[in-house]
Amino acid sequence: MAMMAMGAASWAPIPAPARAAAAFYPGRDLAAARRRRGAAARRPFVFTPRAVSDSRSSQTCLDPDASTSVLGIILGGGAGTRLYPLTKKRAKPAVPLGANYRLIDIPVSNCLNSNVSKIYVLTQFNSASLNRHLSRAYGNNIGGYKNEGFVEVLAAQQSPENPNWFQGTADAVRQYLWLFEEHNVMEFLILAGDHLYRMDYQKFIQAHRETNADITVAALPMDEERATAFGLMKIDDEGRIIEFAEKPKGEKLKSMMVDTTILGLDTERAKELPYIASMGIYVFSKDVMLKLLRQNFPAANDFGSEVIPGATEIGMRVQAYLYDGYWEDIGTIEAFYNANLGITKKPVPDFSFYDRSAAIYTQPRYLPPSKVLDADVTDSVIGEGCVIRHCTINHSVVGLRSCISEGAVIEDSLLMGADYYETETDKKALSETGGIPIGIGKNAHIRKAIIDKNARIGENVKIINVDNIQEASRETDGYFIKSGIVTVIKDALIPSGTVI
């Protein structure tokens, strides 16, 4: 039996990284740092690949420190229609991930591990569960009282100046500029709330400062097959972005090829990956952001398609920063399914929650260990507080408080678990009235499916997409099918004997 039991890593204050003595200047404030940066900008620019590449071996030595000089802004995204029905009752960043976590834990953890401790999360759809999770997982004074760290949700609101809801990524930030500009920082770090990756933002910010950039865009190298699905960028020999193209094809695609050795890739990998795509992750100098959104492009709604291409056109220095690691945009049911199942991959998972040097934090729940009674569990991840009896689980992710009954077979599936346990009294009452308890019933067979929280799957149910349907909407019956993956809705009831 090969079973990985995942425990929730609760957040603990992270000390500021040690800085080399030569880079430590007691008493210098942010204004002094800006004067030093201005002086540097007047010196001849010297290009170094280290300045634009996410190399594990490179050292960071930010002055001023990221905890005092950088504001993290995480964009919660829109209504999440492509992830529906998982977003029916929750915001996209609040969707459960990897048995114990939620999507929002990824960018917040990356921030905390990078010493970015002042964090805002912008959202406007179904934000109740997101607010609850963030308040329980990340308390006040993150990073210690000296740094006055925080993680706060900013919901869309109407005002005399802005009577509309968020119209896009740039508009969301614009509507809260009055709050962001009050922070005495040098840069704004703009992040997405629905990406799965592990990144040291300190290196990203250091590259921004070393290249004297106005804006720095995180870029992912890729081959021709994947490139057609992304917004691509073209750079000059200093790593400066000079052209954008949204999902190009044919000759236009070929024209977007770049020499990725400029950004630090070795020659062999540069031949395999001759394109770079925007990851939707940016560093803006504070004064640049204020000017762009208020003066240059006051009506622009989106960073990727309007603000950043516009900034290059008016002559601003927009740099590319190479991130050569695992990254997944979890924007669709298929991508979400593959990202979750990817953590069970052997011998090396696509994304690991077991990296001690850069932990993923979440809400501490104080649940009991999972109990596995005479079950056959292989190549799977089991969350906390589960009760698994006399069943078979293969290549699956089983979420918090999951209850799986005798004879059940779970294959290539994601079970999100439950928000609470039903008492024995509740179960007895359900049994007497012919009801179905939360969890997976006896002799159920589930294959290539997502079972959302608190679902009640009856006995002898088969969720195996028996007719190989690719797309179907059966909301009144409690499920959808997208890309051939059956998704059972949160709180749904699938009667005993049902075949899907």
From Swiss-Prot:
<comment type="similarity">
    <text>Belongs to the bacterial/plant glucose-1-phosphate adenylyltransferase family.</text>
</comment>
<dbReference type="GO" id="GO:0019252">
    <property type="term" value="P:starch biosynthetic process"/>
</dbReference>
<keyword id="KW-0809">Transit peptide</keyword>
<dbReference type="Pfam" id="PF25247">
    <property type="entry name" value="LbH_GLGC"/>
</dbReference>
<dbReference type="InterPro" id="IPR005836">
    <property type="entry name" value="ADP_Glu_pyroP_CS"/>
</dbReference>
<dbReference type="GO" id="GO:0005978">
    <property type="term" value="P:glycogen biosynthetic process"/>
</dbReference>
<keyword id="KW-0548">Nucleotidyltransferase</keyword>
<keyword id="KW-0035">Amyloplast</keyword>
<keyword id="KW-0067">ATP-binding</keyword>
<keyword id="KW-0750">Starch biosynthesis</keyword>
<dbReference type="InterPro" id="IPR029044">
    <property type="entry name" value="Nucleotide-diphossugar_trans"/>
</dbReference>
<keyword id="KW-0547">Nucleotide-binding</keyword>
<dbReference type="InterPro" id="IPR011831">
    <property type="entry name" value="ADP-Glc_PPase"/>
</dbReference>
<dbReference type="GO" id="GO:0009507">
    <property type="term" value="C:chloroplast"/>
</dbReference>
<protein>
    <recommendedName>
        <fullName>Glucose-1-phosphate adenylyltransferase small subunit 1, chloroplastic/amyloplastic</fullName>
        <ecNumber>2.7.7.27</ecNumber>
    </recommendedName>
</protein>
<keyword id="KW-0934">Plastid</keyword>
<dbReference type="GO" id="GO:0005524">
    <property type="term" value="F:ATP binding"/>
</dbReference>
<comment type="subunit">
    <text>Heterotetramer composed of two small and two large subunits.</text>
</comment>
<comment type="pathway">
    <text>Glycan biosynthesis; starch biosynthesis.</text>
</comment>
<dbReference type="InterPro" id="IPR011004">
    <property type="entry name" value="Trimer_LpxA-like_sf"/>
</dbReference>
<feature type="transit peptide" description="Chloroplast">
    <location>
        <begin position="1"/>
        <end position="50"/>
    </location>
</feature>
<dbReference type="InterPro" id="IPR005835">
    <property type="entry name" value="NTP_transferase_dom"/>
</dbReference>
<comment type="function">
    <text>Involved in synthesis of starch. Catalyzes the synthesis of ADP-glucose, a molecule that serves as an activated glycosyl donor for alpha-1,4-glucan synthesis. Essential for starch synthesis in leaf chloroplasts and endosperm amyloplasts.</text>
</comment>
<dbReference type="GO" id="GO:0008878">
    <property type="term" value="F:glucose-1-phosphate adenylyltransferase activity"/>
</dbReference>
<keyword id="KW-0808">Transferase</keyword>
<dbReference type="Pfam" id="PF00483">
    <property type="entry name" value="NTP_transferase"/>
</dbReference>
<dbReference type="GO" id="GO:0009501">
    <property type="term" value="C:amyloplast"/>
</dbReference>
<keyword id="KW-0021">Allosteric enzyme</keyword>
<keyword id="KW-0150">Chloroplast</keyword>
